[in-house]
């Protein structure tokens, strides 16, 4: 519990890194569209070149989001996080922009459907419980999730879909079922998230958003 409180305090500190901090560091956020619905979002200079750990700037980071594949399931047309990394204090702004982009072009944003670290899960817990400007939407199991839980988990778990007549919200829950068994739907990782484009609007107004 103490570690969780410390993490939340750190996350609140990170969330304070806003547009003014970008201006102070002369850094931009670039949204690079790759394919129809795949995006790379990163901190950059004014020419859209990514900042890195080797630059003089202390601001660097990126997040990659992609449309779900056939194995993952429709996921309510949400885009999935497939990679995220940033300098300390600069992660939340990238996540917010990624969520806003994913909301505009699809059904929002979901965590990585294959593997999520404990620290990353805490980020999603924070979105679910502490961010009033973020909306969560429950996703469902896939047939593969149900089959795997009954055959391979010890002891076996008999699961049922929440919305058996709706396929569009099916989304791989391998990570949540393995960790939470029949309470998988209580996990922050079992959902998709949407958000109004307030961060992107602020970045545009400050001339700090590059869209390729």
Predicted features and spans:
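Conserved acetyl-CoA-binding loop-helix of GNAT-fold acetyltransferases
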Residues: 84-103
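A short helix-loop-beta-strand connector motif used in the catalytic cores of GNAT acetyltransferases and
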Residues: 34-53, 134
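Conserved acetyl-CoA binding element of GNAT-fold acetyltransferases
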Residues: 68, 72-86
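Protein-protein interaction and targeting regions used for scaffolding, dimerization, and localization
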Residues: 1-16
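Alpha-helix boundary/N-cap detector
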Residues: 3, 7, 93, 119-122, ...
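Terminal substrate-recognition subdomain of acyl/acetyltransferases
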Residues: 16-38, 59, 63-73, 103-212
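Glycine-rich phosphate/pyrophosphate-binding loop shared by adenosine-nucleotide-utilizing enzymes
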Residues: 48-64
């Amino acid at each position: 519990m103490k570690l969780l409180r410390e993490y939340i305090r750190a996350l609140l500190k990170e969330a304070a890194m806003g547009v003014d901090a970008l201006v102070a560091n002369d850094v931009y956020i670039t949204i690079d569209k790759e394919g129809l619905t795949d995006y790379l979002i990163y901190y950059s200079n004014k020419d859209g070149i990514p900042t890195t750990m080797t630059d003089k700037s202390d601001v660097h980071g990126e997040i990659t989001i992609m449309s779900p594949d056939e194995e993952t399931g429709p996921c309510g047309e949400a885009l999935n996080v497939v990679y995220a990394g940033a300098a300390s204090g600069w992660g939340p702004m990238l996540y917010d922009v990624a969520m806003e982009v994913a909301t505009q072009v699809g059904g929002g944003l979901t965590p990585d459907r294959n593997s999520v670290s404990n620290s990353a899960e805490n980020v999603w817990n924070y979105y679910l419980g502490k961010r009033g400007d973020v909306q969560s939407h429950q996703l469902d199991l896939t047939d593969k999730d149900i089959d795997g839980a009954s055959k391979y988990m010890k002891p076996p778990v008999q699961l049922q879909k929440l919305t058996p007549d709706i396929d569009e919200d099916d989304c791989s829950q391998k990570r949540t079922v393995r960790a939470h068994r029949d309470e998988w739907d209580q996990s922050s990782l079992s959902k998709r998230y949407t958000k109004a484009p307030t961060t992107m609007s602020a970045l545009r107004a400050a001339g700090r958003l590059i869209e390729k």
